[in-house]
Amino acid sequence: MEFVIGLLALFLILFATGYLFRKNIYKEIDRLEAWKIEIMNRSIVEEMSKIKHLKMTGQTEEFFERWRREWDEIVTSHMPKVEELLFEAEDCADKYRFQKSKQVLAHIENLLSAAESNIEDILKEIADLVSSEEQNRKEIEEVKERYTKVRKNLLAYSHLYGDLYAKIEADLDTVWEGIKQFEEETEGGNYIEARKVLLAQDRLLEELQSYIDDVPKLLASCKQTVPQEIAKLKAGYQEMIDKGYKLDHIQVEKELENLLKELKRAEDALLDELDLEEAAAIVQIIDETIQTLYNQLEHEVEAGQEILGKVPELAAALEKLEASKKDTEAETELVKKGYRLTTGELEKQQSYEKRLEMIEKQFEQVRERLDQKHVAYSLLKEELADIEKQMEAAQREHDEYRDMLQMLRKEELQARELLKQLKQTIKDTARSLEKSNVPGIPEAITEKIRQSQTTVQKVTEQLNELPLNMDAVNERLQEAEQLVTEVKTKTDELVELVLLIERIIQYGNRFRSQDRILSEQLKEAENCFYAYQYEEAYDIAARAVEKASPGAVARLEADAKQPE
């Protein structure tokens, strides 16, 4: 039973698969059939009828005959073949020969694609032929009008073209021959060939129109404008030489010689080769070179004018620097009597003097060359600019040195003022200790006080020495300031601690009669207090009172910090 069911299932699967394959093949056959009908219905004959009004000779006749043959072949050969193959594909599908059916359908696809491509080529060639005829008919009149206009202009202004007149006229004759060839091709039905001829004449006319417009300008530039500019530049150059300008670095004569050679090359390109683009490019380079030379000469004139104004200005500035140097030398000698200058500080003055000496030598050399006119103004201008920068640097160096000298006196005054403040701080600290209830001063603080007093005394002695060494004074003064500040801080802390201990003990006295242990602890704190062991006295008293009255010490400390 199971075997029968299996066979039945297999049969159903095979039947379903065959059905699906046949369905897909029938669908493809229908598509190709529709494509074939579409090709057969294409209006090729109608499209070919569009050229009936053209001259049916030459290329037109050849095209028409070929198109008709190709269309007849499609209709009478390709399409019947396709119809036959469609029946074959359907028959193979009915007999379950699916592989063979697919091969036939692929062959049909290729035949229809080839026919479609052939038809598209025919339609494009028809459109090109019709379009060429229409464009030729419109544009030939424009070309003839332009030809007439160009020839009239050439005749009217023939004197402007010189030797080029014959070449341009020969090109115009070529255009006319081209127009006649166009008419012959059109008459012979060769519309596409006529189109090529017409476009060639159109391009040649554009080129000739460019010649008509540009040749007179270029000839004028080569024959008149540029030679005049070169002559003008040469005259200006000679005038500057006569006035004493040194212009060897510009090499104007060599440049002018090169310009004349380039001008000859531009004329040859124009007259011999009728190469307007090359001639125009050469003329442009010549114009730019002339302008560059003018700019260089003008720069030389401007440099000369600037130098004539700058030299007296720098001379006056150098005299001022020299006077400042002498004043500073005198001031240095005066300062050296009262202050000890370091080697580095003295070297700054020597460096400034050497720099000034070098600047004066360089400036004198420039003045000599200027008087003898041995060098171009533009080169001297650069040297003067360098000298001016050096003078500015020397002035800054001098100002820094002067500021340093003045700073020494200012530092001395500041040191004396700070020393006065430190001495007063020591006195105030001692007075504060005397006024307080401190039973005695710990040895560590006493030693710091002695050190600060000794250091302050040494600073005082250094300030009274001549010459004064401010570096040593400032170093010792900084040490004294640190010691005095430390003494004042520790003294203030000591006074505050003593007052706090007294308050804690006084507060604890109210519990002495009630607490024997507290009484003994306070007694111990008092002993430490009068033995100058203040930290230990505070710890003992604070622990005892805090035990008897929690939070009391914190309240007492807060009250002690409140201003009275």
Curated annotation (Swiss-Prot):
It is found in: Cell membrane. Negative regulator of FtsZ ring formation; modulates the frequency and position of FtsZ ring formation. Inhibits FtsZ ring formation at polar sites. Interacts either with FtsZ or with one of its binding partners to promote depolymerization. GO terms for biological process: division septum assembly; septin ring assembly. This is Septation ring formation regulator EzrA. Residues 99-159, 243-281, 310-498 form a coiled coil. The keyword Iron does not apply. Keywords: Cell cycle, Cell division, Cell membrane, Coiled coil, Membrane, Septation, Transmembrane, Transmembrane helix.
